Regions:
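Short sequence/structural segments immediately N-terminal
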Residues: 1-197
Length: 199
């Protein structure tokens, strides 16, 4: 409770101690805040927040930011390898941002996901596709041997389907299932277009 404790309480003590607003000071009220990163790494400088008695309008609040603004903060650290193509990706263009899927303070799954599993998270927007994948009992997705990210880079790719390998679904599938590429005794034409039509 910050209340009228403008120059008192944990915020003031942490600040007056002469140290920068450290995660240790923030944890007094806010619990575990990923101490290795520090609060200010994401939330910005804390002096005005502390001086105003914990006024929430004086600190960067992700719930008040647009998806692109929040993603810009995250991208200041997470811009390498799998996140390199985020800008302009299908998700970025649809106003989906880092905080649409991830929750640093109260994750429900691995990788700070807002859902218990990756498949459940993807299903919040892609229910029809996930249901189709789960419908086939031979699908490794249903058996938990694959996730959406086994084939898709949700953080951006050079193709519209966000595929990790190849530019089409067929190319992506045969990158693991080379025996299905053909030629075959009787050609199976749909497979050369899109394995996902049936599978």
């Amino acid at each position: 409770n910050m209340g009228a404790a403008t120059k008192q309480g944990p915020h003031a003590r942490a600040y007056r101690a002469g140290s920068p607003m450290s995660p240790t000071g923030c944890q007094t009220c806010h619990g575990d805040t990923k101490a290795a990163l520090g609060c200010e790494g994401c939330h910005g400088a804390g002096k005005a927040h502390v001086d105003a008695g914990g006024d929430k309008t004086k600190i960067r609040r992700f719930e008040k930011m647009s998806a692109s603004e929040a993603s810009a903060v995250c991208s200041s650290c997470h811009s390498k390898s799998s996140h390199a193509m985020w800008g302009g990706s299908q998700h970025d263009q649809r106003n989906v941002g880092c905080t649409s899927c991830h929750d640093v303070h109260a994750p429900k799954g691995d990788n700070l996901l807002k859902a218990a599993s990756e498949t459940a998270l993807c299903a919040t927007c892609h229910r029809t596709i996930v249901n189709k994948q789960l419908k086939f009992n031979h699908m490794p997705v249903r058996e938990g041997k694959m996730t959406c990210a086994s084939c898709h880079n949700v953080h951006g790719a050079a193709n519209v389907k966000l595929l990790r390998t190849g530019g089409t679904i067929f190319e992506s599938c045969v990158s693991c299932h080379a025996e299905k590429r053909g030629p075959m005794l009787w050609e199976h034409f749909p497979v050369t277009e899109n394995c996902a039509t049936c599978h």
